[in-house]
Regions:
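Acidic, aromatic-lined catalytic clefts of primarily extracellular/periplasmic carbohydrate-active enzymes
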Residues: 1-132, 150, 165-226
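Short conserved catalytic/interaction loops centered on acidic-Pro-aromatic/His motifs
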Residues: 127, 145-158
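Acidic helix/loop microenvironments that form the catalytic cleft of cell-wall polysaccharide enzymes
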Residues: 135-144, 175
């Protein structure tokens, strides 16, 4: 991953996800925390350094009890339809800012490893920074293995040849029931189109792959022939 992507990823994704220090459930009923970090199943939560809002470390029993409460498995509280603020008064535990940053850093790295297992993404390290950020954005929303197996065939085929215009045309995630994906989809399309412009212009030194140009809108060089 290019340094600019690692350095600016949270700046990019935080406005799309928000930052929540306590457990809540997303629209799918999955327990989440931080900047859109899934901690479901419970084993993921138990590995984290939760502390009490009033101070002091949380015990495994306290983490388990709160996770179970927020999971709302029978949907009696209908938390997944109410947003994270509905869980504020229900929670007594939290993660510190440092713990959230560490969790996000680990997830970004693990997503990259998963992405590179897909044969069409093997050249990921060669991609322009804007394309890498778009791919990490999709992985943040769907998981690093989102394109494994036979999933996303048209998108994978475009990425295999670094056809980032094709990637832009085939990267849209399903927004049904999850309107929060609308701005992320818009950003990802923008990023892939930028990456296509970078490849088109790099030979003439208009652009370079290490630079993350987003949120600028890049244009491909215009070739004028007599």
């Amino acid at each position: 991953m290019r340094p600019a992507v690692a350095a600016r990823f949270l700046e990019f994704t935080r406005p799309l996800e928000g930052t929540v220090e306590y457990m809540y459930v997303d629209v799918k009923g999955l327990v989440t925390i931080g900047i859109g970090n899934l901690i479901d199943p419970i084993g993921v939560a138990l590995a984290l350094p939760f502390v009490k809002k009033v101070g002091g470390a949380a015990t495994p029993a306290e983490i388990t009890a709160e996770w179970t409460l927020i999971k709302d498995a029978d949907n009696s509280k209908q938390l997944k339809t109410k947003g994270h603020t509905a869980c504020t008064a229900l929670t007594k535990l939290k993660l510190t800012d440092a713990a959230i940053l560490d969790l996000c850093t680990q997830r970004l790295s693990s997503n990259e490893l998963e992405l590179k297992k897909v044969k069409e993404f093997k050249t990921f390290d060669e991609w322009p920074a804007d394309a890498q950020l778009a791919m990490q954005s999709m992985a943040w929303a769907m998981g690093g293995a989102f394109a494994a197996g036979t999933l996303w065939p048209s998108f994978r085929a475009a990425c295999a040849t670094m056809d980032f215009d094709g990637a832009a045309a085939n990267c849209k995630m399903n927004e049904s029931g999850n309107p929060g994906l609308i701005p992320r989809n818009r950003a990802d399309i923008h990023l892939f189109k930028n990456a296509a412009a970078v490849l088109a212009g790099e030979a003439d030194k208009y652009y370079n792959r290490d630079t993350l140009y987003y949120p600028l809108v890049l244009l491909k060089p215009i070739v004028i022939t007599p």
